[in-house]
Amino acid sequence: MAITYLKRSPKTSSTDDTKTREIVENILKDIEKTKEEGCKELSKKFDKYEGDVIVSKEKIEEIKKNLDQKTKDDIQFSHERVRKFAEAQLKNYGQDFEVELSDGLFAGQKLIPVNTAGCYVPAGRYAHIASAVMSVTTAKVAGVKNIIVCSSPKPGVGVHPSIVYTADLCGADVIMNLGGVQAIAAMTNGLFGNAPADILVGPGNQFVAEAKRLLFGKVGIDLFAGPTEIAVIADETADPEMVAYDLVGQAEHGYNSPAWLFTKSKKIADYVLQRVPELIEDLPDLPRENSGAAWRDYGEVILCDTDEEIAKVSDDYAPEHLEVQTKNLQWYHDRLKNYGSLFIGEETTVAYGDKCSGTNHILPTKGAGTVSYTHLTLPTTSS
């Protein structure tokens, strides 16, 4: 038995952690002293935004009126799927109960929603509409009374109109023109007239993730989410073109987004090694820059001898998103243990789960899938 790296990444997801931690610690200390004014100055510095922080009800109504109907329909479709899945999770995940342990001794469990949830919605390179659906909808279904949304504003515009519409549709009580570490600090400390968040949820870049990590304890967090990850398990029956496309589709999220292929097929591996750079070269400027750096620095192709070896490698990596494109899907379904979200069958791509199949895309990264709850996306979602 042998595991061979046909392409091994020169970097890991922890390469820049020390520098990131130092930057975030300094920002958080500064905001503790400067409060709202410090947040505004950082928003001006990083986002070139100098407008109001709180999105007014009038602005929300204006966006709802002017946003194109196709975008609204797509958002509502995603919201309905995610809401239904969240309701099913709430119903089946845990129930209130009381039990008599001995004569006269009663013990029980009661699920009580937090009062305030702070939902972070990334909008640095792209407006992550789906992140608003995933975080706000789930908090609303859980019964959270006060939901605050923060997202990076654009100069002269504020939060992306589609994110404002989505957050309002899904049940946000307050929407703030604030992104980055300053947004996490503002929600944690109850700035701009809001109650302090009891929990922070939602993905973000390495600085947002580090801010959540440093503030954990003062505030609850969903998980420590780093850059998005994809791993594809493929055998000789897989379509190598589809494998290559799926790897690039996640790598383009950011310059430090790992993309991994685990396979027994040298033919599949060689095809992907040749094809991925070609696909990257055909992308528009920003996605090409992101995916090129991600594949160069974090991409890996690992050749194994057996299915068991592949499963062991996959469980060791515990990828955020894991696709299985093999002839023995059921074996992998039963064998694999560590992942954030599992996508079974070649027609079940990560994009479905990330956008609108219903399962949540706020998932563990950097190996945290070994101790986190997992989701399963079956081929029927592609129909």
Name every feature range the model reports, one short phrase each.
Residues 1-115:
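N-terminal Rossmann-like NAD(P)+-binding subdomain of aldehyde/semialdehyde dehydrogenases
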Residues 103-104, 154-158, 178-186, 329:
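Short acidic loop-to-helix transition motifs that present clustered carboxylates
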Residues 257-373:
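NAD(P)-dependent aldehyde/semialdehyde dehydrogenase
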